[in-house]
């Protein structure tokens, strides 16, 4: 281990787990963080813990952000709304959680500064999530500038979004090359013991494995 530290925003899903593999390959000591924010698919936290254990991390923090449920405005935090199954398009889907990635990256930056980490890994993909405003390169660049201006980190920490230009198929190929434990992950928005296979997240995941010529190791209904 080189002594270099990196914070990884870890949801327990395919993308963030791939980022764990990327960070490990780059020689970083990984410090994953996960979030309870009243999401209907909070099962993902248990998956995140399994992934963190697989990578034998020094510490895995889970932060509570229940106020995001109080804010509402998303089918992921409001049980009265149905999860969108319309597919990824130009419109913002109702699974978008207002301000979520802004808050996640702000907390990640605070934690990274406190522990002296030089990298923050986040698994956003502008290609697959074209409808999510906080998955665009412009957003990541803006948050990078915010971190430069608003922290006392020395050296300045940088946000790494290694999947930003990758399709889901390319992401799966990368993860397989890095021996990422996809069998420990979950992507389903409904949060059941078995993935639904119908929500946008499940469909993108299945499409990714198909494009990669591989079989998804998790169970579907």
Swiss-Prot record:
Its EC number is 6.3.4.20. It catalyses: 7-carboxy-7-deazaguanine + NH4(+) + ATP = 7-cyano-7-deazaguanine + ADP + phosphate + H2O + H(+). Pfam families: QueC. Pathway: Purine metabolism; 7-cyano-7-deazaguanine biosynthesis. PANTHER family: 7-CYANO-7-DEAZAGUANINE SYNTHASE (PTHR42914:SF1). Gene3D superfamilies: HUPs. It comes from Oceanobacillus iheyensis (strain DSM 14371 / CIP 107618 / JCM 11309 / KCTC 3954 / HTE831). CDD domains: QueC-like. Zn(2+) binds at residues 188, 196, 199, 202. Homodimer. Its cofactor is Zn(2+). NCBIfam families: 7-cyano-7-deazaguanine synthase QueC. This is 7-cyano-7-deazaguanine synthase. Binds 1 zinc ion per subunit. Belongs to the QueC family. One of its GO terms (biological process) is queuosine biosynthetic process. Catalyzes the ATP-dependent conversion of 7-carboxy-7-deazaguanine (CDG) to 7-cyano-7-deazaguanine (preQ(0)). GO terms for molecular function: ATP binding; ligase activity, forming carbon-nitrogen bonds; zinc ion binding. The gene is queC. ATP binds at residues 10-20. The lineage of its organism: Bacteria, Bacillati, Bacillota, Bacilli, Bacillales. Keywords: ATP-binding, Ligase, Metal-binding, Nucleotide-binding, Queuosine biosynthesis, Zinc.
